[in-house]
């Protein structure tokens, strides 16, 4: 089937993992992801995934790939898991094929249900309990047999009685590169990630505006983030995905053309462009918000295409009635010290002077707040090393 690793798991409750999950929730680290807060006990009881199941087969496959094309002149980076096609239907189909092979082997039909990141289940803890790897400080499953952390994890619940695999005994040791390099300091003690600060949450699951203090730290990430994986020693020799569905040529690739992104007309156009891509998750509004933040960061760098960016952002804002997107567009222009950006920003402020967002836009046009860029590196880190 092309899976890199397959282990067998029991359906016993994950008591210790439940304590970790509750601690994560109690600290408010789930942010606005209310679906993760509902019935937390259910997430550490694998048996609830399929009534009548007796075992779970846990599989992993790498999604890693390197860029194969030159990025557009004005680009935003896409997390590696999303460069190809949506993994949910692809992996579920493979699990069904695998189940059919097992059925031939056992000589009888059996109850089964495939899942991949779409069931109320603490997947990392279950995978670690049965030898797929261990939960690293960035909360991802790590281990030499995985060749790093760039892996999709999936489960096939069955009513077959199978012998479970034992845990893998591994740790990160004293290494904390993921936490040290995280631009927003989202990685906390105890292998807990504060979603309120995580770039992946901010650009994917977050439905609201992005905190202006965090925007410069996104760097060039328009969808997701791989920084904590890129710096991890376990990822020093990643295995390229063997599945063509997850390769960049099958999807949008590693970079997104941000000027083209601003031309998306409506939700219908958005769905057409990204029909089978994971980047549909934040919807049109969220992806445009992300693009405006990255464009602002490009302007802060002094991008070679500054005038094109200013013109595109100004045109976009002039056609918008969504106050969140207008504010993010104004913020982006405010990162630029060019006179053209000042003119464009003033035009936006005048057009929305009577709206609730008017005072915010007016503040951006003030001399004290205009043209004071916050330089960041491509990874999202402030160049002065401060938050």
Where are the regions a protein language model picked out?
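Intrinsically disordered, low-complexity segments enriched in serine/proline and basic residues
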Residues: 370, 374-375, 379
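Alpha-helical adaptor scaffolds
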Residues: 252-266, 272-285, 289-303, 315
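Amphipathic alpha-helical scaffolding segments comprising HEAT/armadillo-like alpha-solenoid repeats
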Residues: 269-273, 303-318, 338-349
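Iron-sulfur cluster-binding cysteine motifs and their immediate structural context
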Residues: 3, 13, 177-200, 207, ...
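Alpha-solenoid repeat junctions
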Residues: 295, 299-302, 333, 337, ...
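Auxiliary alpha/beta "docking" domains used to position bulky ligands
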Residues: 1-171, 351-353, 360, 386
